[in-house]
UniProtKB/Swiss-Prot annotation:
Binding site for S-adenosyl-L-methionine: 222
Stated role: Flavonoid 7/4'-O-methyltransferase involved in the biosynthesis of polymethoxylated flavonoids natural products such as myricetin derivatives, aroma compounds possessing antioxidant properties and exhibiting pharmacological activities such as anti-carcinogen, anti-viral, anti-thrombotic, anti-diabetic, anti-atherosclerotic, and anti-inflammatory effects. Catalyzes S-adenosylmethionine-dependent regioselective 7/4'-O-methylation of flavonoids; active on various hydroxylated flavonoid substrates.
Gene: MOMT2
Organism: Solanum lycopersicum
Residue positions of the active site: 260 (proton acceptor)
Subunit structure as annotated in this protein's UniProt entry: Homodimer.
GO BP annotations, alphabetical order: biosynthetic process; flavonoid biosynthetic process; methylation
Protein name in the entry: Myricetin 7/4'-O-methyltransferase 2
């Protein structure tokens, strides 16, 4: 029987199931954070056998209240549903890490654990919860609505939050640096003698590149509170300063996840600064950009959804955005670059080489 608004019973049941998925979705990151706090990914990773029984897992959990042990299989059940762990019933209720679960292992070279913990920081969650209020006020970002100042000013004023943010960027950089020096991006750094990593944070990417290419001088440029007392060695150097003021001269410049933090006007301004600081195209000059290229790739719905959510995050946090290829091309031309090449082998993000 159809209801008055022409929704059949089957459609209503399907809609209700979907709505409950949205309602309960707040528990997903909470359960994952709980697993990280308990050290479950690390315990499974360090276990001698790939499959660990439930009883052994419970015994290995530090500081677990004995009265709460019955909750662990409940927690593990939902984490299996999320795809973090495999469940092996025939091995005595055993568990093993999935590829996604391995990304939550502490200090894993391909991990994004620190980025997950940053996303669950109260300051970040407060921003997301303030979007409705922000849409009614005159402030530039929801971050300012929630926390009273811009993201960058907040980082400069709050050492704890700044540390969590830098850890997240460093974790992502470790993952990305492994891809950059792999076959995925073969040839990008070949022939270069000097490289400036703008906004390179703690230097994770530059260190990996410097290690893979000993004859390539790598300079990390970032703000003083980010560089702090970090010292370089060998072919790695740290320079404190603003990218909008002065960029050291080099063959090439690396912008990893930088431009999506800024609006079009500031991006063009920064790209012009980069163009002034690199060699000519004939001498190998280029700017290497690692950023997202928005696309409607309907063959990968999860990728598209992640890109849409990332675009939303950039808009409410920095008053910036993710960009389509046409939007990128417009920036490059306005900044005076002659051409570009895209390497689409970095999953959610792409590598773009632009030439003076």
């Amino acid at each position: 029987m159809a209801s008055n608004n022409n929704i059949c019973a089957y459609e209503l049941i399907e809609a209700e199931a979907q709505s409950w998925d949205y309602i309960l979705s707040y528990l997903r990151p909470s359960c994952i954070k709980c697993a990280i706090q308990l050290g479950i990914p690390d315990i499974l990773h360090k276990n001698a056998d790939p499959i660990m029984s439930l009883s052994d897992l419970i015994a290995a959990l530090p500081n677990l209240n004995p009265s709460k042990t019955t909750f662990i299989p409940i927690l593990m059940r939902v984490l299996v549903d999320f795809g973090l762990f495999n469940y092996h019933q025939q091995q005595g209720d055993g568990y093993s890490l999935t590829t996604v679960g391995r990304l939550l292992v502490e200090n894993h070279h391909f991990g994004n654990r620190s980025f997950f913990l940053f996303a669950q920081h109260p300051v970040v969650l407060n921003t997301a919860a303030s979007v409705g209020d922000w849409l009614k006020d005159d402030l530039r970002t929801a971050f300012e609505t929630a926390d009273g100042k811009s993201h960058w000013d907040y980082c400069g004023a709050d050492p704890e939050f700044n540390g969590v943010f830098n850890d997240a960027m460093a974790g992502d950089s470790r993952l990305m640096s492994n891809l950059l020096i792999s076959d995925c991006c073969a040839g990008v750094f070949e022939g270069l003698t000097s490289l400036v990593d703008i906004g390179g944070g703690t230097g994770a990417v530059a260190m990996a590149i410097a290690g893979a290419f000993p004859s390539l001088k790598c300079i990390v440029l970032d703000l003083p509170h980010v560089i702090a007392d970090r010292k370089g060695s060998g072919n790695l150097e740290f320079v404190a300063g603003s990218m909008f003021d002065k960029i050291p001269h080099a063959n090439a410049i690396l912008l990893k996840w930088i431009l999506h933090n800024w609006d079009d006007e500031d991006c063009v301004k920064l790209l012009k600064k980069c163009k002034e600081s690199i060699s000519s195209r004939e001498n190998g000059g280029k700017v290497i950009i690692i950023d997202m290229i928005m696309e409607d790739n309907y063959n990968n719905k999860q990728l598209v959804q992640s890109q849409h959510l990332m675009d939303l995050i950039m808009r409410i946090t920095y008053a910036s955005k993710e960009r389509t290829e046409k939007e990128w091309e417009k920036l490059f031309l306005e900044a005076g670059f002659s051409g570009y090449k895209i390497i689409t082998s970095l999953g959610l993000r792409s590598l773009i080489e632009i030439y003076p």
